[in-house]
Amino acid sequence: MPRRRLRVTGRPPASSRIPRGVRTVPWPDYGEIMSITSRRGWRLLGPAFVAAIAYVDPGNVAANLTAGAQFGYLLVWVLVLANLMAVLVQHLSARLGVVTGASLTELLGRRLRPVPRRLFWAQAELIAAATDLAEVIGGAIALHLLFGLPLIWGGLIVGVASTLLLGIQSLRGQRPFQHVVMGLLLIITIGFTAGLFAAPPDWSATAEGLIPRFEGADSVLLGASMLGATVMPHAIYLHSRLSVDHAGADAGASEPTPGESAARRRALLRASRWDVVFALVIAGSVNIAMLLLAAGNLQGVPGTDSIEGAHAAVAAALGPGIGVVFAVGLLVSGLASTAVGCFAGADIMAGLLHLRIPLLARRVITLVPALAILAAGWDPTRALVLSQVALSLGIPFALIPLVRCTADRTLMGEHVNPRWMTILAWAATTAIIALNAALVWLTAVGLA
């Protein structure tokens, strides 16, 4: 049976599946969308900021603090490279959603045969579960640091709070949800950069850290973990869906003329580029700040191989106020990222299995594995780092279809990737797969 080809139209198809409980925004007014470079253009920003929450989740905290505490400034280059890759990847994801009017998972659901489609869904759901695990555990650790709550109770509170956050998306629509998430991203940024301003890093050592190199198997493992925490599979799936919703996928929007449709699409693509750059520059800066904070203040300090130990060391070195701000940043990171991850999981199921479960019901279901880990007494920081390794292994399954779809002229029309962009995307995908292969080999032979 030949693969189905999708024709590009001026309006997202009416069949575009949106997870139940998700409200879309109206198709933007023509005058508004053409004013992206004016004062009103900021209103078109937002989807990338929601996706960027995935880049500053508790898994990043565990991976980046561990890397800085163990290897100092050695792996700065990994974060810089990973964030450059993230800008390219999220741009492609947004581009796909704007041009086709469908998310990546929906396109794969149409193109894949039943068995490959179910297998793809299974691995995507496992990756989403690993993501949720990291986010709930991170929030629980933050509540323990702030109030001394047992981890299991902290996990329950994070689950309830993230459910309320999802309620904003379900009841008020995407734009209010985006505004809330952008505010949370600001709090996260303050929480994880305050310590850096209090104790600036060694900038000459930071510059040396930009030279690509590893030192032993453990640094490769951490490099893969940092890459998995930075280039997030569920963020790739989610951003294409958010772009569809933001462009106005609801059936009640007015039908544009062909000329307006082309102009709107070009303006939306221009807006999405700025959206991605702004959001990921912020997220990337936060990631690098985490590593520099650990490299400058935690290297060689006993007990910093856990988030709790790192927090104690930061508070001891920079004062209890910085410690509280750090813990608040971690808590908000967990709350925001678990809600965003649940939304991404709903799109995965809707696009690949054509099943739609209410977001609130899905939140309850996905909370169970994280609570089980907390109740079992496993080392939470180790669970966070391993979850990021799992995310790294899932990246190729999201990247390869994304690059293939955005390089398909039949699907993308005049907005197909330029040749240089496709080459860069394939180079990034190849590098990630090679690093993953090294990680699997090191784990198999017991070196990692």
Regions found by a protein language model. Give the residues of each.
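Juxtamembrane transmembrane-helix boundary signature
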Residues: 51, 78-111, 120-126, 165
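Membrane-interface loop-to-helix entry segments
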Residues: 157-158, 169-196, 214, 390-391, ...
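Hydrophobic alpha-helical segments and their helix-loop junctions in multi-pass secondary transporters
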Residues: 185-211, 220-241, 402-410, 435-447
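Flexible loop linkers connecting adjacent transmembrane helices
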Residues: 63-68, 91-116, 168, 172-173, ...
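Loop-to-transmembrane helix boundary motifs in multi-pass membrane proteins
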Residues: 115-117, 152-155, 278, 321-323, ...
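Transmembrane alpha-helical segments of multi-pass small-molecule transport proteins
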Residues: 121-125, 146-168, 187-191, 356-372, ...
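Extracellular loop-to-transmembrane helix junctions
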Residues: 39, 66-91, 105, 109, ...
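Extracellular/periplasmic helix-exit of transmembrane alpha-helices
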Residues: 86-99, 243-247, 251-261, 281-309
